[in-house]
């Protein structure tokens, strides 16, 4: 059976699209293996619970400062710090700190952005965990206010390659690639939910 010209053109276009998508997807996957994100969920969307979420975030970031190994001992330390902050602020909400693989949409921070995808995450759930959330990168320590040095230096020391650093900090050149990664990531995320 012989293919028609339009069929050949269609197949060539599909192959080209797959190749264009492959590089950013590969870089995102390798990047995700080197980062641990922090995900803090408030009890509710009330003004008080949202303020508490940020106070708990600060306590967790302070407790994680200088740590390079994310093990059960550190998770327990983070949970104790979060629970102590909740109690100190006069609330009786339970706090759960877990390590999970979570799907994150593309996120733009002050000095860099991360493509959508699955990342290792430390999840801090305050009370019902039904409120708006907050996230950043806990390892390497790239959260605003957490990193006292140039974040690119910290990223290099954590093992990120120049291509990975370029992917997350060159916003203009990677907008299309992030959209492709987002589209592909959302499709895979929806397929996993089925």
Predicted regions: what is each one?
Residues 20-34:
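Aromatic-capped interface at the extracytoplasmic side
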Residues 2-12, 162-194:
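Extracellular glycan-modifying ectodomains
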Residues 7-24:
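Hydrophobic membrane-insertion alpha-helices, especially the h-region
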Residues 57-65, 83-91, 144:
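Sec-exported extracytoplasmic/periplasmic mature domains
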Residues 37-68:
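Short extracytoplasmic
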Residues 73-137:
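Mid-length scaffold segments of soluble, non-membrane domains
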Residues 4, 9, 28, 84, ...:
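Charged, low-complexity intrinsically disordered segments
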Residues 112-176:
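Soluble extracytoplasmic domains of inner/organellar membrane proteins
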